[in-house]
Amino acid sequence: MLYIIKPFLQKLRYLLQLLLTQIVGWSAECHGSWFTRIIIKLFILFYKVNMQESLQQDIAFYKTFNAFFIRYLNKNARPINSNPSVIVQPADGIISQLGTIQDHLILQAKKHFYSLEALLAGQTRIINYFRCGNFTTIYLSPRDYHRVHMPCNGVLRQMIYVPGNLFSVNPSMVTHVPNLFARNERVICLFDSNFGLIAQILVGATIVGSIATIWSGTVMPPREKVIKCWHYPKFGDKNAVILLKGQEMGYFKLGSTVINLFRYGRIELCDHLYTNCITRVGLPLGYSNKKI
């Protein structure tokens, strides 16, 4: 009997997560005037959001909750490290894990690992690039700035949408749900760079209304059940998508996680970084083993 009930319960849980996400996403786009302002005020108070960093500090400026959530920061709020040999932190949040990829296994939490194959949806060519390389996982809490930036100069070569679950990605869930990041919906972005091929992966979660990139707009929704791939021209082509270090590359409407993958032998992660340390866009994340 259990083998019949279990798939049904899993499907029901997914549908409830999807329904909740759609309701929250719809609500966050509603133009509610006074109601929207009340929700924003309560959110700021509850999560202790630092509005002094925001480009627009008057909450009356924000016509929807999502407009507030993806607010811009002041121009000088996140200075970008200009050393060309340094890779910078792509998002505000905390480092939930970082370190070396153990052949093909990435640490999710203590005693929990997930595979490159699962995270990268079986894309064999890409998987082999990152074996034994380095990774970082940054969790964006509701209070954080939710625009994601480039860790280095890069030329976009591929974007992959991977359908999946919508588990919460808060620290408690990450500790208890096996293979969480490899099971959740996500958008994988691959860039050629002076540090070799790098991956920047935006992971969806419960109540993440959407994920968007600056070159394609909203990637999800619509939520689909098939893997979708987009390929982009290399450097030198007039249609190449070139992004500079510190430049915005996308955003979350409600919080989630950013995972970065780096090739073996191309970078060293900064010694001062550790699990649960705070990250800020533009601060050093790692550095090249060779002069750039």
From Swiss-Prot:
Highest taxon above the source species: Bacteria
Membrane topology category: Peripheral membrane protein
Keywords annotated in UniProt: Cell membrane, Decarboxylase, Lipid biosynthesis, Lipid metabolism, Lyase, Membrane, Phospholipid biosynthesis, Phospholipid metabolism, Pyruvate, Zymogen
InterPro entries reported for this sequence: PS_Dcarbxylase, PSD-B, PSD_type1_pro
Cofactor: pyruvate
Record note on modification: Is synthesized initially as an inactive proenzyme. Formation of the active enzyme involves a self-maturation process in which the active site pyruvoyl group is generated from an internal serine residue via an autocatalytic post-translational modification. Two non-identical subunits are generated from the proenzyme in this reaction, and the pyruvate is formed at the N-terminus of the alpha chain, which is derived from the carboxyl end of the proenzyme.
Modification sites for Pyruvic acid (Ser): S256
Pfam families cross-referenced by the UniProt entry: PS_Dcarbxylase
Disulfide cysteine pairs (residue numbers): none
Pathway: Phospholipid metabolism; phosphatidylethanolamine biosynthesis; phosphatidylethanolamine from CDP-diacylglycerol: step 2/2
Annotated cofactor note: Binds 1 pyruvoyl group covalently per subunit.
Localization per Swiss-Prot or TrEMBL: Cell membrane
Molecular-function GO terms, alphabetical: phosphatidylserine decarboxylase activity
Family: Belongs to the phosphatidylserine decarboxylase family. PSD-B subfamily. Prokaryotic type I sub-subfamily.
Biological function: Catalyzes the formation of phosphatidylethanolamine (PtdEtn) from phosphatidylserine (PtdSer).
Subunit organization: Heterodimer of a large membrane-associated beta subunit and a small pyruvoyl-containing alpha subunit.
HAMAP family attached to this UniProt entry: PS_decarb_PSD_B_type1
Protein name (record): Phosphatidylserine decarboxylase proenzyme
Organism from which the protein derives: Baumannia cicadellinicola subsp. Homalodisca coagulata
